[in-house]
A protein has these predicted regions:
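Subset of outer-membrane beta-barrel
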Residues: 23-245
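Cleavable N-terminal export/targeting peptides
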Residues: 1-35
Length: 245
């Protein structure tokens, strides 16, 4: 009798052990982070893109809104406007592109306001069905866009900070119902920039240090989808040294 009890007790312990192992193994299942509106990570200007997507600490220019909004008080010009157009993956598709309009204005000698509008077109996409899963095929023109406004302030002759608020909108379908709607999100950028001049030999060089955290904000969700997706938050930390030739 005692052997039978011992047998059942052993089976019960093994069952508990296997159940615990199954729970632990389930928790270790690969669970990647899903990110939406990844077009926010595409470099909008040729200068930074040509240097390998650097811009947190480079010399301030009109496109600093995307890379580090805190750089604007150090710009030489009081105001600036730029329009950029970038064909995207042109060797694969012919109609994907990024358009970027940005501008800034320095208020006095120590602060600046800035704004930008970003539009990313994914071109024409052929679908098999409409949003209800039935009917004829549709031609979809999905796009993602964002609008932001920023303010930057020089705290000393060598250091400045800045922030920007952003509205992000993603329209990936051709037609919508009450349960299926475009996605939207709000985000903010925080930046800091340090600029000084150092002597290296007989040359006076410009040293720059920059920190920028972009797209700190809410997740984005689409109507009818129970899931919400992260937006691409990025941390940029850089240093630059301009040496006159």
């Amino acid at each position: 009798m005692s052997r039978i009890k011992l047998f059942f007790a052993t089976c019960a312990l093994l069952s508990c052990s296997l159940h615990s192992f199954a729970q632990i193994d389930k928790n270790k299942i690969f669970n990647p982070v899903t990110t939406s509106v990844t077009s926010q990570s595409v470099a909008p200007d040729a200068r930074a893109g040509g240097m390998g997507d650097v811009g947190a600490a480079t010399d301030p220019d009109v496109a600093s809104q995307y890379w580090n909004v805190a750089k604007y008080p150090f710009t030489i010009s009081r105001a600036g406007v730029s329009l950029n157009y970038t064909p995207w993956l042109r060797k694969l598709v012919s109609d994907m592109n990024l358009a970027y309009l940005v501008g800034y204005y320095r208020i006095g000698e120590h602060s600046a306001v800035s704004t930008s509008l970003r539009y990313f077109s994914l071109g024409e996409v052929q679908t098999n069905y409409n949003s209800t899963g039935q009917g004829a095929a549709l031609t979809v023109n999905p796009y993602e866009m964002s609008f932001d406004a920023g303010y930057s302030l020089m705290l000393s002759e060598k250091f400045s900070i800045g922030t920007a608020v952003r509205f992000i909108y993603s329209d990936l379908k051709a037609d919508y119902t009450d349960d299926v709607t475009p996605g939207s999100a709000f985000a903010a950028d925080l930046g800091a920039y340090y600029q000084d001049y150092v002597n290296i030999g007989q040359r006076e060089c410009q040293l720059g240090l920059g920190l920028n955290i972009s797209n700190i904000g809410s997740k984005i969700s689409f109507g009818g989808d129970n899931n919400s997706y992260f937006i691409p938050t990025n941390l940029r930390l850089g240093a630059s040294l301009m040496v006159p030739i």
